């Protein structure tokens, strides 16, 4: 018969901060953990830990629903989304809900529905969280062995990993289904300035999809962040979804190999550190994606990227001065290079001036003016459309630069608008959170390894200075 470790709440791999092993209670004396390490009390109480996780999910979903409705209530259809401090509606718009040609919002009802659905879901999760935290069984091993676990049980842990991977794979396929069958998604590259369309011709070629992973991360290459058509993005989700589901099935059906059993630490704190490390990587990648990529994060909703705003400024003044009679092909700038156009070191024609550093920008309002050797002079003279001028002028004055007190835009741009771009918020927040998660990964990895090696003692709580101080109250 399997030993029920849950009946012995404390076992050697998990490290206590003092030697007390008495059961029950919520204080330091009975649990071995001070108030600030409250989660640690639940390490071996699978039922209570389930309650904590479900309640946490409820809080997250409640925030999503409430914030969603808050943004709907404050939304002004006449202004671009990125001028209104919105961080949720741009995601819904990118999925093709409520928008039409050019990214114009034609119906806010889907956004309202999204908010209400999240609020209802959060109530269900909140009830489940409170039930499992207060009323449900403390441990699940005895009554519900399928949901029970012991942190040291390697086979059960990889089964749980497999279930999580399958759920992630299903999530990836939900986006694929939305793009293929349920109204499509917003494509910023659709002719004439973007539109919602169904993705019919998926990119499934492994050489293309995995080619992104093999690219250099630097300018002109840009690793996976350089993806710039929806066929590749949705095709990539097919691959990711399939790999997650197959990998999840594999982890459910197999037991860890001997090398994995030896190499990894098998404790709750170790799994926490692995998870934090993975989330940290996701955060850093998301930061780069939202900052540089204007296909997955269309500029119509998130505002222009930094390079895009800079190139838009060069384009706007090229249009203006060309109308005033300047010969933009040969005009010389203050450094002796071309004032409006110049050649890059590899020979293609790019915008001149300081924006030359952003030569590798690709944007839907600019690409129609390129030829085989970069910007095409005859197209710049004859083919510029009014929507391209309007969009670049708008992006020029909405650079994603700014501070928390909303002094946004380029410091030298007299037409800049006081706003902070959602791109700035999303990139900065994901970088900062990614960094903190990385620090948490190092902290918990160090503790888990030390505990596994048997020399983690923690701080001696019996002689802590605070214990001899006068109570605050």
Swiss-Prot record:
GO terms for molecular function: chlorophyll binding; electron transporter, transferring electrons within the cyclic electron transport pathway of photosynthesis activity; metal ion binding. The modification Phosphothreonine is found at residue 15. Residues 1-14 form a propeptide. GO terms for biological process: photosynthetic electron transport in photosystem II. Keywords: Acetylation, Chlorophyll, Chloroplast, Chromophore, Manganese, Membrane, Metal-binding, Phosphoprotein, Photosynthesis, Photosystem II, Plastid, Thylakoid, Transmembrane, Transmembrane helix. Belongs to the PsbB/PsbC family. PsbC subfamily. One of the components of the core complex of photosystem II (PSII). It binds chlorophyll and helps catalyze the primary light-induced photochemical processes of PSII. PSII is a light-driven water:plastoquinone oxidoreductase, using light energy to abstract electrons from H(2)O, generating O(2) and a proton gradient subsequently used for ATP formation. It comes from Illicium oligandrum (Star anise). The chain crosses the membrane at residues 69-93, 134-155, 178-200, 255-275, 291-312, 447-471. Binds multiple chlorophylls and provides some of the ligands for the Ca-4Mn-5O cluster of the oxygen-evolving complex. It may also provide a ligand for a Cl- that is required for oxygen evolution. PSII binds additional chlorophylls, carotenoids and specific lipids. [CaMn4O5] cluster binds at residue 367. It is a multi-pass membrane protein. The modification N-acetylthreonine is found at residue 15. PSII is composed of 1 copy each of membrane proteins PsbA, PsbB, PsbC, PsbD, PsbE, PsbF, PsbH, PsbI, PsbJ, PsbK, PsbL, PsbM, PsbT, PsbX, PsbY, PsbZ, Psb30/Ycf12, at least 3 peripheral proteins of the oxygen-evolving complex and a large number of cofactors. It forms dimeric complexes. It holds the Pfam family PSII. It is found in: Plastid, Chloroplast thylakoid membrane. GO terms for cellular component: chloroplast thylakoid membrane; photosystem II. This is Photosystem II CP43 reaction center protein.
């Amino acid at each position: 018969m399997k030993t029920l470790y849950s009946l012995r709440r404390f076992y050697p791999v998990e490290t206590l901060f003092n030697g007390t092993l008495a059961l029950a209670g919520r204080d330091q004396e009975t649990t071995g953990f001070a108030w600030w390490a409250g989660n640690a009390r639940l390490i071996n109480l699978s039922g209570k830990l389930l309650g904590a996780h479900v309640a946490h999910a409820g809080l997250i979903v409640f925030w999503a629903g409430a914030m969603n409705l808050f943004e709907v209530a404050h939304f002004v259809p006449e202004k671009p989304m990125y001028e209104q401090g919105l961080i949720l509606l741009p995601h819904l718009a990118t999925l093709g809900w409520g928008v039409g040609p050019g990214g114009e919002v034609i119906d806010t009802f889907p956004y309202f529905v999204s908010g209400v659905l999240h609020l209802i879901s959060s109530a269900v999760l909140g009830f489940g969280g409170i039930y499992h935290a207060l009323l449900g069984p403390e441990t699940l091993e005895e009554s519900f062995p399928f949901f029970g676990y012991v942190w040291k049980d390697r086979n059960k842990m990889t089964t749980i990993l497999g279930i999580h991977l399958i759920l992630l794979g299903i999530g990836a396929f939900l986006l694929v289904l939305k793009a293929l069958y349920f109204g499509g998604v917003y494509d910023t590259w659709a002719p004439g300035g973007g539109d919602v369309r169904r993705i019919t011709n998926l990119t499934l070629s492994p050489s293309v999809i995995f080619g992104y992973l093999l690219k250099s991360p630097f300018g002109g290459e840009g690793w996976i962040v350089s993806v710039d058509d929806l066929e590749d993005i949705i095709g990539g989700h097919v691959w990711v979804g399939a790999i997650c589901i197959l990998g999840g099935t594999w982890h459910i059906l197999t037991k860890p190999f001997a090398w994995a059993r030896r190499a990894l630490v098998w404790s709750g704190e170790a799994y926490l550190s692995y998870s934090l490390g993975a989330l940290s990587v996701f955060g850093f990648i998301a930061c780069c994606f939202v900052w540089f990529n204007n296909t997955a994060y269309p500029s119509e909703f998130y505002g222009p990227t930094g390079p895009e705003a800079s190139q838009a400024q060069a384009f706007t003044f090229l249009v203006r001065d060309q109308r005033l009679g300047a010969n933009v092909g040969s005009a010389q700038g203050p450094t002796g290079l071309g004032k409006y156009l110049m050649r890059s070191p590899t020979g293609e024609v790019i915008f001149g001036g300081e924006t030359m550093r952003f030569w590798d920008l690709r944007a839907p309002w600019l690409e129609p003016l390129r030829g085989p050797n970069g910007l095409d002079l005859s197209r710049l003279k004859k083919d510029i459309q009014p929507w391209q001028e309007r969009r670049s002028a708008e992006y020029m004055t909405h650079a994603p630069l700014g501070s928390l007190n909303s002094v946004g835009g380029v410091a030298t741009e007299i037409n800049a608008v006081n706003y902070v771009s959602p791109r700035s918020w999303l990139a900065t927040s994901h970088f900062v959170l990614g960094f903190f998660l990385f620090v948490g990964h190092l902290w918990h990895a160090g503790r888990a390894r030390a505990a596994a090696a048997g020399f983690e003692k923690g701080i001696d709580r019996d002689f802590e200075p605070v214990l001899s101080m006068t109570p605050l109250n």
